[in-house]
Every structure is written in C-alpha cells, then in structure tokens.
Amino acid sequence: MSLDRLRPFRRGVVLATTSLAVAMVLAAPPDRARAQARAAAPAGAPAESAAALAARLQARYDAIKDFTADFSQTYEGGVLRRKTTESGTLLVKKPGRMRWEYKTPEEKLFVADGRKLYAWVPADRQVTVSALPSGDAPATPILFLLGRGQLTRDFTPSLPGAIAGAPPDSVAVALVPKTPVPEYDRLTLVVDRASLGLRMLIATDGQGGTSTFVFTHLRENVGLPDAKFAFTIPRGADVVAQD
C-alpha cells in the first residue's frame, strides 16, 4: 500500500485522537493550581476508583470555556509501521469550536466552527468537509468539545497500573468506549495524582498504532473570538464532502 493511500487513514486517526486529547487537557487544572491541590491532598488517602477519577476529570472539563496550547504528537506502529512526530498549536472554544494547526514537519489544519469540520492539507490542495457528530452518535471524541459527551456514560474506565515513561506521583486511567468506534480502541490518561494535571495521553488504534500527546504553554479562559474558528476554502482547492 502506498504512502499516498495511507494519508487519509493517518489523518483520520490524528483527528479522532487529538479531539479527545483536547477534552482531557481541558479537564486538567491550570498550572498555578497544581501545587495547591497537591498540598491539600491528605496523606495516606485511599486509592481513588477509576470511575471517581473519570468523574472528576469530566467536572473540570465542564468548567472550562476556552483553551490554548502548544502540542507535540508522536505516532508509531500501526499501518505505517514507523514513528512520526508532529507539532503545532491549538485553540479550543466550547461549544464545538477548535483549531488544530500542525506546523512541522507538514502543515495541516483542522478547524471546527460549531457546525462543520474542515481538514486542510496544503500539500494535497484538498479540503475535507464533514458535519460535527450529533448528541446521539457513538462515543466520538468531538462530542466532548460539543459539551454532549460524558466519560463515565460513554466509556468504561479502569486503572491500568504502571505505564512506561509515566512520571512519579502520577496515576493512569484507561478509557474503553462502550460503543466501539473505528478511530481508536483505548485511551490512557496519565495525570498528576493530586491535582489531575495532565502529563500524558496515549491513544491506541485497531491497527496497533499508538499516538502520544504532550501539551505545553496551557492557557485557559482567555476569551477567544469566534473569528479564530472561521475557515475559508482556499481558491483552487479540491473539496471532498463526507457524511
């Protein structure tokens, strides 16, 4: 199978996993609150259940209005059988607006304006347009950006134990969708044990591929204007509409 034929698959994986990554990052408290939360955690407290941890993550996400960050993403294994690393910036505004701008090594842009989702790859001169999922859709990551998804309702959480590369004083929660979806099989979140600050997000797909995300320079509730999430189809670009 040629690399060109694999591109649509890889971009679909990117879109699905990055969308839920946003939701999980929004669930983490800001950096300035982490030290306070860690100090307030009682020593010797009993281990928290996976369901309780997922519920706290959801509650934190529900309180966030908008969000900006830099990100890096590493994908390895799967159909491509090789390792790739990409980076860029993201903007998120609820309900249902996001802007993922990949800068290296290849420019790509994913924009959701609240109704439509646009995927633009300048090298291909192609824009893919699709509708955002409805509230009765399966547990797609984008539903969390729309304010319709619920971790404990849509996923079965569990505590997977030690995760390779996880920092000290962290805890992991694995999320398996109750309704199977094609984009991924499982998501694993590694968060600070006391503050829920996100450290790692690992998404595993059905082809054996793994995406690992790292977010830096997080800023919450900055008052992002809707204009940041408008997309104009470039002149001369091919447009592919997806149901």
Task: Explain the meaning of each model-derived region.
Residues 82-88, 209:
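Amphipathic hydrophobic-ligand
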Residues 77-79, 97-99, 106-109, 125-127, ...:
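Short beta-strands and strand-coil junctions in structured, solvent-facing domains, enriched
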Residues 35, 128, 150-243:
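Gly/Pro-enriched, hydrophobic low-complexity segments
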Residues 89-140, 211-212, 217:
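An acidic-aromatic
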Residues 31-83, 233-236, 240-243:
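N-terminal leader/targeting segments and the immediate start of mature chains
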Residues 2-19, 29-30:
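Bacterial N-terminal signal peptides that target proteins for export
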Residues 51-54, 58, 114, 142, ...:
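Extracytoplasmic/secreted envelope proteins and their assembly/folding machinery
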